[in-house]
C-alpha cells in the first residue's frame, strides 16, 4: 500500500517521533523511506542586498549547516539500513511546505509522515503551520505526529 514514505526531518524530538512512525510503517509495508531535510530561507537575495547582508557569507553558512545536517543524517541512514529499510536522503533549502509537497510529487510518495514544529503563536493561527499547509496541498495522505506523542 505504501511503497514510498516521505519523512521531513529536522532532528528535533517531534520529527524523530515521526521518523519512528515512518520506520514502523516501512516495516509493515516493505516501504522505502525518503528523509528530507529542509533549511528555510529567512531572507530573499533581494532582502539581503537591501540589508547589506553578504549573499556569499550566507551561502557559506548554508553549506556549513548542510554539512552538519548531512553528518547527522548519515547516522540515521545507517540505522535505517541496519533495519533493512531502503532509504534516500535529500537536502533542500526553501519554504518547507513547498519543498515537501514538491518532493512528494517528484518521488511519487504514497505517504508523508511528519511532526509539527510546536509553535503556538498568533501568526500560526492566521497564516497556518507547515504541517497544515502540507495537508492542504499534498496529493498523498499525510500523517502528522501531534504534540505530546
Task: Spell out what each predicted region is.
Residues 66-78:
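Alpha-helix-centered segments that form part of catalytic cores
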Residues 55-69:
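A short acidic, glycine-rich active-site loop
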Residues 102-149:
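Gly/Ser-rich helix-loop-strand patches that form or flank binding pockets
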Residues 68, 91-95, 117:
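Short beta->alpha linker loops
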Residues 78-112, 149:
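Structural beta-alpha unit
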Residues 3-56, 83:
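Small/aliphatic-rich secondary-structure junction motif
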Residues 36, 88-92, 143:
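General small-molecule cofactor/ligand-binding pocket signal
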